[in-house]
A protein has these predicted regions:
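Conserved, function-defining micro-sites of small-solute handling proteins
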Residues: 1-162
Length: 162
């Protein structure tokens, strides 16, 4: 998502900037702090310790709402970039064909756990916002995200190799 957020930024502002395809945030953060690159899109967990100590400055979050971990940081939309949403998300998946009773029980337990105050506090400290959903809502979200990023990948001319 980080690379695609950068491509969306380039396209949105019609910028002529070089995309440096780092393989992970482990090398990006030191290069950003060291002034070797001017900016990056990063997930919250690896960045927040540096934001909290003043070594990095968070300009905006790319979600639709402010982060619980950084409530003073505006969304890209609030910062004046309409429609700019590119979130890094985590979900639980099971094999296709898993019985609905098992899916329902797992979903209920995951949602119950996400509501526990100590779990919420730990996740917020890491820079993660929680949102429990139903399997149907997750399926719809995954389809929408896939369609959105497929369009962006084509528009940006992104090529990949494995």
């Amino acid at each position: 998502v980080h690379h695609l957020a950068g491509e969306l930024f380039k396209i949105t502002f019609q910028l002529d900037m070089v995309h440096v395809p780092y393989k992970g945030v482990g090398a990006v953060i030191p290069d950003l702090i060291g002034g070797h690159i001017p900016m990056t899109f990063s997930s919250m967990p690896p960045s927040m310790p540096y934001v909290k100590t003043g070594r990095l400055r968070a300009l905006a979050v790319t979600s639709t709402r402010r982060s619980w971990a950084a409530p003073d940081v505006p969304t890209m939309i609030a910062a004046g970039v309409p429609g700019f949403v590119a979130t890094n998300w985590f979900a639980y998946f099971v094999p296709a064909g898993t019985p609905g009773t098992i899916v329902g029980k797992l979903n209920a337990e995951i949602n119950r756990t996400l509501k526990l105050e100590d779990v919420k506090a730990t996740l917020v400290e890491l820079g993660l916002d929680t949102l429990g959903t139903t399997p149907e809502e997750l399926g719809k979200f995954v389809r929408e995200e896939s369609e959105k990023f497929e369009k962006l990948i084509k528009l940006a001319g992104v090529k990949g190799a494995y």
